[in-house]
Design a protein with these regions (language model features):
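Short, glycine-/small- and polar/acidic-enriched structural segments
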Residues: 1-101, 110, 117-123, 137-140, ...
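Solvent-exposed, acidic/flexible segments
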Residues: 3, 7, 22, 60, ...
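Secondary-structure end/capping motifs
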Residues: 161-241
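Conserved C-terminal helix/tail region of periplasmic/extracytoplasmic solute-binding proteins
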Residues: 231-264
Length: 264
């Protein structure tokens, strides 16, 4: 089932009991736990999901520090806003140093028309925009876990308890996928390719030279620490009203059981 509305719609479906398991980003999970939903993370999908920024060709932006005083498109309360904040801080700036335009759906158009100087997007988004002539890739989070987003498998706690085999089957499938792309990267790129997202895109987002440890289904302790930092940022910005402990939202028991079947 696809959710075009993203994390908000997914959390609403969990709350109403219409959804048992979903693949989500780190922000929806934090919001879900802050709102008291009985859900937990049981597998990692991507611990370093790439984010990036495309700068307009006439924006004068050549390095992240040049974003100061510029109009940057990002969506409040999403991974784009978080990435922008973290990138600015890493370069001695803050969100107060830029004018944020909260219109991510039209980000590419705004930059191409000169009504915005830069736009934040996912790795896929920045690649597509740069290749369609919107602008140039300023920077991405590739190779920097602290600037990257995370994606997980999340399920209703009671459903997972009653359907352990389902959770383990998902983890086993994720493990097989990781093993396949590790052993056959070129074939994996070709299998993922579409007319909109060609093989070259996946070669750039998932470079075989970097390895594929970010696709390991086990949720690591450092991932919980990154989520706790993210939760504090979301609390400070009013996205959530109550802080959470990410470690309490993670359940690796299903991974440990599924791991007994993995090829050593």
């Amino acid at each position: 089932i696809g959710f075009a509305q993203g994390g908000t719609a997914i959390n609403e479906a969990f709350a109403s009991g219409q959804l048992d398991v979903a693949f989500v980003g780190d922000i929806p999970e934090i919001i879900a736990k802050s709102n008291g939903l009985e859900v937990e993370l049981f597998a990692n999908l991507n611990s370093e999901a790439e984010m990036g920024i495309v700068a307009g060709k006439n924006s004068g932006i050549k390095k992240p520090a040049d974003l100061k005083g510029k109009k940057v498109v990002a969506a409040y309360g999403t991974v784009t806003y978080v990435y922008l904040n973290n990138l600015l801080q890493a370069n001695g700036l803050s969100l107060d140093d830029v004018e944020v335009i909260n219109d991510i759906a039209n980000g590419g158009t705004l930059v191409a028309s000169g009504n915005a100087d830069a736009v934040v997007s996912t790795g896929t988004g920045v690649w597509q925009m740069s290749h369609s002539g919107v602008g140039d890739i300023l920077t991405t989070s590739q190779g920097d876990a602290d600037l990257s987003s995370q994606f997980f498998a999340m399920g209703r706690t009671n459903y997972l308890k009653e359907n352990k085999v389902a959770a383990e089957a998902i983890i086993q499938a994720l493990q097989r996928a990781k093993e396949y792309i590790t052993q056959n990267p070129e074939k994996a790129y070709e299998a993922l390719a579409t007319s909109d997202n060609p093989k070259e895109l996946y070669e750039n987002i998932y470079p075989k030279e970097s390895g594929f440890d970010n696709l390991d289904p086990q949720i690591k302790e450092e991932q919980a620490e990154r989520m706790n930092s993210l939760a504090k940022f979301l609390l400070e910005n009013g996205t959530i009203s109550k802080d959470i402990d990410a470690k309490s939202a993670i359940n690796n028991e299903y991974y440990e059981e599924a791991g007994k079947t993995f090829t050593k």
